[in-house]
From Swiss-Prot:
Subunit structure: The glycine cleavage system is composed of four proteins: P, T, L and H.
EC number(s) on file: 1.4.4.2
Protein name: Glycine dehydrogenase (decarboxylating)
UniProt lineage: Bacteria, Pseudomonadati, Pseudomonadota, Gammaproteobacteria, Enterobacterales
InterPro entries: GcvP (IPR003437), GDC-P_C (IPR049316), GDC-P_N (IPR049315), GDC_P (IPR020581), PyrdxlP-dep_Trfase (IPR015424), PyrdxlP-dep_Trfase_major (IPR015421), PyrdxlP-dep_Trfase_small (IPR015422)
The reaction(s) this protein catalyses: N(6)-[(R)-lipoyl]-L-lysyl-[glycine-cleavage complex H protein] + glycine + H(+) = N(6)-[(R)-S(8)-aminomethyldihydrolipoyl]-L-lysyl-[glycine-cleavage complex H protein] + CO2
GO molecular function, one term: glycine dehydrogenase (decarboxylating) activity
Length: 953
């Protein structure tokens, strides 16, 4: 029969591009698991009382081309003014070699957090470059890589100061009043939940306030004044008060390092190192501190270690500080954040080198000084006499100045009483300075730039200029031609294993396809170039896209409202718990502070709860991995009027749909608590059920899991929160940007009003191309894929937890403990051996020690699933060889895995041959790790977190 035009138009073509198993493959897989249809399989697995009766109203699927055309039309509604607003955001030039070879390269943006260092040496080296950049510019001893944004880094600095303070009774944190307003906003929020007293005053008044544990200063104030805080910080040190300094990363190329001036903690945004403003993000924050604070620092730290062969290798160090291990006692709830952006910033420094960076910073500063002199000669008053790149100009007719600016297509900072602010940047040229002078003065003449340049004096005193060299390491002085830079980045990429080479079956991580069509819009200048504090009418396209995406997510979650501000899943948890706290306080029930958390929960949950000022009570799980309802009732009753909420993940972290989830919600509500449903496993809910329908009050969504934003090697992410109507007034708002009906008046949790807005087009594209039916199919196939793996592997590796009919949800936990007890082969050995088969390991020892948690997602075809299954079965056969005594327990292919090319070329002394070691899956498409198994203990005992000679790699 002839196909109809509608069929030939194939509007739902993308669904089959995104979902890995073809229709025939799905039939085969369903037969393998013993089901006759996807619908029948879901009916066996998902409790009937929570299944949706109707599809969410998110529209039908469309093609990649049509979705791109629709989004392009929306993007064109954004007006591309030149923004000289400053306030921590500046226009940049992203080097095309970095744009093409990193930001647009799936070998970089689809990788996961480098928990498996053997398959992550490339991005670990890039992150070490970022840390070295941070160390050189700040003048401090230890740096992390990296944090979410400058404002949240300020909050982390405040918390670090409290943890590190020797003044244990002190509870007051002082903040200079010329810190960026969005930073003040986030600090107020965080201080409130921590119970700190926050004092905001002139910096000179800091010493007048008693009971201080820390002080936050901004080296170049928000209105542009360059400060000399040396004497103040010396006195603070004498009084054992910790000095935290917010710094502009590019300014530090010219200015004296704050660490050399007495600062204990230095932080800021690395956005100016090649990362577009993107209407607020994503951008990586840098963070550095003194050596004695290292074990209290937030965020991931990359260190130099060695592998089993004694060769130099890199890894994340001091992981026992982090939320996935220390839970409510963690330094922070932050997981790896903004790695892709930190890598861009680090490679920007590698590409330009110290001389190139000095040229860029020097040009910006010189143009600023020329403009300042021109304005001074026009009898205008400048608020400050020392600056780097920002001027505050007093004007009589402010409205007239702003009108001329608007007519010229430029934005000035307008929130300063009686003045306008002007911040120059890397893109500023002579013509811009000319236009700015005309706009501010109202004069029609021209500015004699060369004459002013010849006559201008340096406004920065010598004692505030940098005297120590920066970026002397060879990595910053070698790759300045595009050819060399391209090859260096490719060498780093080849060391890593990302989704462009193999499935990454990490449980609880949802490493699904990040389609090219979804990624294309993030580099469109209409999205990339907007300042987050530009006039709202200039961001009409962003507002429409965000509003539409919010409506879709509300439909998919069953909630009434959505807040797009949290720029990570951890931030979403904090924001959701904060909404619960504010809600209770609004009802005069501020005593409700107990958060119930199942023992199976991810460590971020208790870490977020303590950050929100709550105390954690653990609820037991039964032998089947489900929440123990008897224990829940007892704990809820015991908490009584102090019960704030429960944090629960669904499907559970054990990989099953708990039949009693609605009863869990009812019990908590009965005692006056709220239900926080963690959205980590939303990929098994979309289109099938929803948190709101289940009975939850608030959830965060990991857009970097369920909705296709790539993991980027450890960020960026987005963690918007959906809430029921009664919590809607209590979600984060923003001090700087006021949008009635869109943003509340509550305090912020992130620097920008819509978090990392420039990556939201990825999720918009995914939902638009999939439509309601495609989204449901994605969830169904994710569940099918997990059950296919569980069915085929359960004889070799027991599946620890199953639900009804022996089924799992979208992930399964393989129990390695019996094998370890019998043979000594551990989950670690299996994880490392999988590298030789060309796979990234599943999640190790979470949520149960001695297990592997596997989540294949819907994007993997049967061919790739079979390749993984075959690898796991082959490894099981290898374990049997150890059990049978064919290979010694101390010298076999597993305990020595993985194998490098160097090792194969050397002397071979093992009781198995090289082919078994390095080519267990054959010779085709072989992935070679750059290093052997890491020596974790050595790396933590011999802490070294800066660049080593390139010859060591």
């Amino acid at each position: 029969m002839t196909q109809t035009l509608s069929q030939l138009e194939h509007h739902d073509a993308f669904i089959a591009r995104h979902i890995g198993p073809s229709a025939p493959q799905q039939v085969h897989m369903l037969a393998t698991v013993g089901s006759d249809s996807l619908a029948g399989l879901i009916a066996q697995i998902v409790p009937a009382d929570i299944q949706l009766a109707a599809a969410p109203a998110v529209g039908e699927a469309t093609t990649e081309a049509q979705a791109l055309a629709e989004l392009k039309a929306i993007a064109r509604q954004n007006q591309r003014y030149k923004s000289f607003i400053g306030m921590g955001y500046s226009a940049v030039v992203t080097p095309p070699v970095i744009l093409r070879n990193m930001l647009e390269n799936p070998g970089w943006y689809t990788a996961y957090t480098p928990y498996q260092p053997e398959v992550s040496q490339g991005r670990l080296e890039a992150l070490l470059n970022f840390q070295q950049l941070t160390l050189d510019l700040t003048g401090l001893d230890i740096a992390s890589a990296s944090l979410l944004d400058e404002a949240t880094a300020a909050a982390e600095a405040m918390a670090l100061a409290k943890r590190s303070s020797k003044l244990k009774q002190a509870n007051c944190f002082f903040v200079a009043d010329d810190v960026h307003p969005q930073t003040l906003d986030v600090l107020r929020t965080r201080a409130g939940t921590f119970g700190f007293e926050l004092v905001i005053d002139k910096a000179q008044a800091a010493l007048e306030h008693p009971d201080l544990f820390g002080v936050l200063l901004q080296q170049v104030g928000t209105t542009g004044e360059l400060h000399d805080y040396r004497a103040l910080m010396a006195e603070l040190t004498r009084r054992k008060i910790i000095s935290c300094v917010a710094a502009d990363m590019l300014s530090l190329v010219l200015l004296a390092a704050p660490g050399e001036q007495g600062a204990d903690v230095v932080f800021g945004s690395s956005q100016r190192f090649g990362v577009p403003m993107g209407y607020g993000g994503p951008h990586a924050a840098f963070f550095a501190a003194r050596d004695e604070m290292k074990r209290a620092m937030p965020g991931r730290i990359i260190g130099v270690s060695r592998d089993a062969a004694g060769d130099t290798a890199l890894r994340m160090v001091m992981q026992t500080r982090e939320q996935h291990i220390r839970r409510e006692k963690a330094n922070s709830n932050i997981c790896t954040s903004q790695v892709l952006l930190a890598n861009i910033a680090g490679l920007y420094a590698v590409y330009h080198g110290p001389q190139g960076l000095k040229r860029i910073a020097g040009r910006i500063h010189r143009l600023t000084t020329i403009l300042a002199q021109g304005l001074h000669d026009a009898d205008l008053t400048l608020r400050h006499d020392r600056w780097f790149d920002t001027l505050t100009v007093e004007v009589v007719d402010k409205a007239g100045v702003l009108a001329r600016a608007n007519a010229a297509g430029i934005n000035l900072r307008s929130d300063i009483h009686g003045a306008v602010g002007i911040t120059l940047d890397e893109t500023t040229v002579r013509e811009d300075v000319q236009t700015l002078w005309q706009v501010v003065t109202g004069a029609a003449g021209t500015l004699a730039i060369d004459a002013l340049d010849a006559g201008c004096d340096e406004v920065i005193p010598p004692e505030l200029l940098r005297a120590t060299p920066i970026l002397t390491h060879e990595v910053f002085n070698r790759y300045h031609s595009e050819t060399e830079m391209m090859r260096y980045m490719h060498r780093l990429e080849r060391k890593d294993l990302a989704l462009n080479q193999a499935m990454i079956p990490l449980g609880s991580c949802t490493m699904k396809l990040n389609a090219a069509a979804e990624m294309i819009p993030i580099t469109w200048p209409e999205f990339a170039e907007l300042h987050p504090f530009c006039p709202p009418e200039q961001a009409a396209g962003y507002q429409q896209m965000i509003a539409q995406l919010s409506r879709w997510l509300i439909q998919l979650t069953g909630y009434d409202a959505l807040c797009m501000q949290p720029n990570s899943g951890a931030q979403g948890e904090y924001a959701g718990l904060l909404a619960i706290r504010r809600y209770h306080e609004s009802r005069n029930q501020g005593e409700r502070h107990i958060c119930l958390i199942p023992s199976s929960a991810h460590g971020t949950n208790p870490a977020s709860a303590q950050m929100a000022g709550m105390s954690v009570t653990v609820v037991a799980c039964d032998k089947n991995g489900n929440i123990d309802l008897h224990d829940l009732r007892a704990k809820a009753e015991q908490a009584g009027e102090q019960l704030s909420c429960i944090m629960v993940t669904y499907p559970s972290t054990h990989g099953v749909y708990e039949e009693t989830i609605r009863e869990v919600c009812q019990i908590v509500h009965q005692y006056g608590g709220q239900v926080y449903l963690d959205g980590a496993n939303m990929n098994a809910q979309v289109g099938i059920t929803s948190p709101g329908y289940i009975g939850a009050d608030v959830s965060h969504l990991n857009l970097h899991k369920t909705f296709c934003i790539p993991h980027g090697g450890g960020g960026p992410g987005m963690g918007p929160i959906g809430v029921k109507a009664h919590l809607a007034p209590f979600v984060p708002g923003h001090l700087v940007v006021e949008l009635d009906g869109v943003l509340t008046r509550q305090g912020a949790v992130s620097a920008a009003p819509f978090g990392s807005a420039s990556i939201l087009p990825i999720s918009w594209m995914y939902i638009r191309m999939m439509g309601a039916e495609g989204l449901k199919q994605a969830s169904q196939v994710a569940i099918l894929n997990a059950n296919y793996i569980a069915t085929r592997l359960q004889q070799a590796y027991p599946v620890l937890y199953t639900g009804r009919a022996g089924r799992v949800a979208h992930e399964c936990i393989l129990d390695i403990r019996p094998l370890k007890e019998a043979t000594g082969i551990s989950e670690m050995d299996i994880a490392k051996r999988l590298i030789d088969y060309g796979f990234h390991a599943p999640t190790m020892s979470f949520p149960v020690a001695g297990t592997l948690m596997v989540e294949p997602t819907e994007s993997e075809s049967q061919l790739e699933l079979d390749r993984f299954i075959d690898a796991m079965l082959a490894i099981r056969a290898e374990i049997q060889q150890v059990a049978d005594g064919v290979w010694p327990a101390s010298d076999n292919p597993l305990v020595n895995a993985p194998y490098t090319q160097r090792e194969l070329a050397g002397e071979w002394r093992h009781p198995y041959d090289r082919q078994i070691a390095a080519f267990p899956a054959g010779y085709g498409d072989k992935y070679w790790p750059a290093v052997k198994r890491l020596d974790d203990v050595y790396g933590d005992r011999n802490l070294f977190c800066a660049c080593v000679p390139l010859s060591d790699y």
